[in-house]
Amino acid sequence: MKRCMFVDESSVIRKVAKRILSGPDMVVTEAASGQDALEMCAFEMPDVVVVDGSLADMPAPELIRRIRTIAGKMPPQILISLVEVDIGAIMRAKRAGAHGYLLKPFNRPQLLERFRALPVAA
C-alpha cells in the first residue's frame, strides 16, 4: 500500500485530495504546516509528498530539503502544488529535490493522472 501526504494550509485542498486518492492501494495523510509535515515524516515517511508552494511557516524548498534529509537513501516522490505556473518556484523546488509540480485547484482526472505519472503511484 502506498502512502501519500498532502501538506497544505487549506483544509479544503487536503480533504479533496484525500477523497480522490484514498482507496485500497493508497493511504492519504494530511499536514497543515511544514512543521507538522516534518514531524509526521520523522515518524513514518510517505511514498509521495505534495507540498503547498505557499506555506506560512517555512518556504517550500526548505521543507523539501528537510524531508529529503530525514528520508536518507529512500526519499519520497515530492511534488510542489501551486495556484499558477511559476517557473521560478518550480525551479527552486526542483533544485531542492522536488520531482514535479501540481496545479491547484485540481479535479479528480487531473490529480489521478499526475499520480499515475509517478513511479511509486499505484
Where are these regions (language model features)?
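Two-component/phosphorelay signaling modules centered on CheY-like receiver
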Residues: S11-T29
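Acidic, metal-coordinating helix/loop segments flanking the phosphotransfer/catalytic sites
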Residues: E30-V48
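Short amphipathic alpha-helix used as the core "switch/output" element in two-component signaling
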Residues: E39, P61-M74
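Active-site residues of response regulator receiver
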Residues: D52-S54
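The feature encodes the CheY-like receiver
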Residues: A56, D86, P105
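Alpha4 helix (beta4-alpha4-beta5 surface) of REC/receiver domains from two-component response regulators
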Residues: E62, E84-G100, E113
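Hydrophobic/aromatic residues positioned on beta-strands within the core alpha/beta folds
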Residues: I80-S81
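C-terminal output helix
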Residues: F106-F115
